């Protein structure tokens, strides 16, 4: 993209540092007295805080190129032809703004490779679907290899883990704040969502060696 820089429609949308600041503020206030019941989830997220900074720090250091990203790349934001099922266009463009391409690959991986619903109460059903991940990345890389840098390529899998983590942070923050951002259908909905994201990260981590080996072998 060689045109003028787009405006940030939602400033620092995928800024992991800011999201942790929001979590820490929500935790300090604990307006609904919920923190004591989610110690394990909080411990996990804070233990992974430093790793979660890789994309935002990459942008700041310019190791990652800034481009134009959609920032909400889930399959239900693609409009399909009713008769042929062929994709027609991308929709829901209110979050289009500057970012790293890895924001988009990350959200695509997060939403496409989970074997369960985003709000599955039984986290044993939440698994990272490695065969689907492979097919997804092979298809993506066949089109993206011309513009992805080696560093961006090396972080393709990490991007999925990263965006899953930021969603868990945001969901737990909203839970602590009294469910003021995300629509909920029952009082525990946000913490159920967050637990699903954390379970997906743990499933990714269990398979990480083969995941990263696959990424390292792309295009070779």
Regions found by a protein language model. Give the residues of each.
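Structural signal for terminal/edge beta-strands and the immediately following C-terminal loop/tail
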Residues: 196-220
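All-alpha amphipathic helical-bundle segments outside canonical DNA-binding/catalytic cores
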Residues: 148-160
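ATP-dependent phospho-/nucleotidyl transfer catalytic cores
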Residues: 2-70, 75-89, 162, 180-185, ...
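Catalytic activation segment of kinase domains across protein kinase-like and atypical kinase folds
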Residues: 62, 76-117
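Conserved helix-loop functional segments at active or binding sites
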Residues: 29, 51-58, 93, 111-114, ...
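Active-site activation/catalytic loop segments of kinase-like enzymes and analogous catalytic loops
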Residues: 102-146, 162-181
